[in-house]
Amino acid sequence: HEIELIMDVAKETLQSLTDSNAATDWVNKYVTPYSQDVNFKYIAVGNEIHPNTNVAQYILSAMTNIQNAISSRKFTIKVSTAIDSTLITNSYPPNDGVFTSDAEPYIKPIINFLVSNGAPLLANVYPYFAYANDQSIPLAYALFTQQGNNDVGYQNLFDAMLDSIYAALENVGASNLQIVVSESGWPSEGGAGASIDNAGTYYANLIRHASSGDGTPKRPGESIETYLFGRCLSENQKQVLILSVIFGLSLPISS
């Protein structure tokens, strides 16, 4: 399979991209020269931008301008933004997931943009962080090695986290919006449960699960388009994760 990439827009660039000419220049500089050789699947305008930060106000305008520049060049790249699980509250059971009161007014116009452009919402889903923050969560549940379902019908933490985001989308009337998992990973050292063995188990099982077509309880029978994060999760440890994950790139694991 050809490698497909998610291209991130640097956080410090977001404000300038609210100017349409700057967005056109950005596409001309970073996308157009490489478009024949690189398969850009998505452009992520902002990665884990929180609603109460200064740059949040620039996201939708920057997305719109980048999309217009992309469309004018007849590229088929989809423009989105990547959220993380901190924008979701009441995430267990997953069916109760909703956007936080801060996140809802931020995300709703973005959702409308995505729906109108046929683009998915990008979401970074890290069972590791949930496990590290609450070690009453069984490690096997986080690593896809638990046998049988838990009391709300879930066999693994990844599905539960993903479905809580789907529930939040349903709650704001966006039940048809697809989620693409733009990052997922497990560290090989540096924290509770972080080891080469656990990382290897997580990646192997995630790849198997995402490509199986089983889907999640809320979205059964679908492959889960998922990209692996290619660096250690700890920002001060830059070693490459095990498996053949290319440093600093997200690699697709679904066709």
UniProtKB/Swiss-Prot annotation:
<feature type="active site" description="Nucleophile">
    <location>
        <position position="183"/>
    </location>
</feature>
<protein>
    <recommendedName>
        <fullName>Glucan endo-1,3-beta-glucosidase</fullName>
        <ecNumber>3.2.1.39</ecNumber>
    </recommendedName>
</protein>
<dbReference type="Pfam" id="PF00332">
    <property type="entry name" value="Glyco_hydro_17"/>
</dbReference>
<dbReference type="InterPro" id="IPR017853">
    <property type="entry name" value="Glycoside_hydrolase_SF"/>
</dbReference>
<comment type="similarity">
    <text>Belongs to the glycosyl hydrolase 17 family.</text>
</comment>
<keyword id="KW-0326">Glycosidase</keyword>
<feature type="active site" description="Proton donor">
    <location>
        <position position="48"/>
    </location>
</feature>
<keyword id="KW-0378">Hydrolase</keyword>
<dbReference type="GO" id="GO:0005975">
    <property type="term" value="P:carbohydrate metabolic process"/>
</dbReference>
<dbReference type="InterPro" id="IPR044965">
    <property type="entry name" value="Glyco_hydro_17_plant"/>
</dbReference>
<dbReference type="InterPro" id="IPR000490">
    <property type="entry name" value="Glyco_hydro_17"/>
</dbReference>
<dbReference type="GO" id="GO:0042973">
    <property type="term" value="F:glucan endo-1,3-beta-D-glucosidase activity"/>
</dbReference>
